[in-house]
């Protein structure tokens, strides 16, 4: 099944009271095209979870971190680590809350309603999360009635750095993070590697059978400044996960039901700035593969991918006064 969407966007953002903006004014990304706006002028309820809060959280999975620091949301998770995890905004169904990762629309074309679940997103390599509550349809499309969750990965900092972190806990759980990053005047990079492994617990009562979960993932973020006016940015994420779970049959306790997922997202941006103009041409890709095994040993495969081409132009009078225009074309496809 294939679907093609084309969207034209023309927006005028004017806030006369903020023609002059102090250098320390907090800014927030309010669209997948990364249009900057000071947080005080955002016309929606918004919550920002910064890198300090994410790093200090005792949770390893990003969905649980969001639930810890965000309010007035419906959070649900089926079973332990690896179980379906989602956040509902404004009390609406999950499909009415869109998720973006570095500008990539994370909607699974192979799922019945296109929903994307957060169960395979770990917190490693995540710089911040911005949650816009309330309808965002004009910026994000018709699915963003409840709101939008924008997730941004880390970028390299000046110099050369490396970090390693090892965590262990009950149920033979291990969480290993390693990252290296750096930057100079022309180039910046961040690469984060993560392995999460646990024996898990059973979703069913009255048995001690384990439902294991494994997550191997990598996050990469790269930027290169060709000259004073032109730069290139590329971010990617790859995750290979395996999850065992129980059927609804009470007579079965260790039935070998499992799902093996592969998720890949990539965003490539060409950015040109001159005077008050900024033009961004981007290509975003999402690919999801799911391999399921039922209690009889029968296997079923699901494939979904999304390709999007975006052009975003800005004429900036100031931080909060600008004209934004652009066009977007998407191709969704799925098969079994």
Task: Place the predicted regions along the sequence by residue.
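Outer-membrane beta-barrel domain signature, strongest for Gram-negative TonB-dependent receptors
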Residues: 213-332
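Short acidic/polar hinge/loop motifs at secondary-structure boundaries
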Residues: 105-133
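Periplasmic-side early beta-strands and strand-to-turn transitions of outer-membrane beta-barrels
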Residues: 138, 150, 157-159, 167, ...
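Extracytoplasmic beta-strand/coil segments of soluble accessory domains associated
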Residues: 63, 67-105, 127
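Membrane-embedded beta-strand positions in outer-membrane beta-barrel channels/transporters
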Residues: 86, 128, 148, 161-165, ...
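Non-catalytic regulatory/gating segments with a bias toward low-complexity or hydrophobic composition
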Residues: 54, 66, 129-130, 149-151, ...
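Outer-membrane beta-barrel pore domains and translocons
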Residues: 33, 134, 152, 165-171, ...
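N-terminal periplasmic "start-of-domain" segments of outer-membrane beta-barrel proteins
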Residues: 27-57, 86
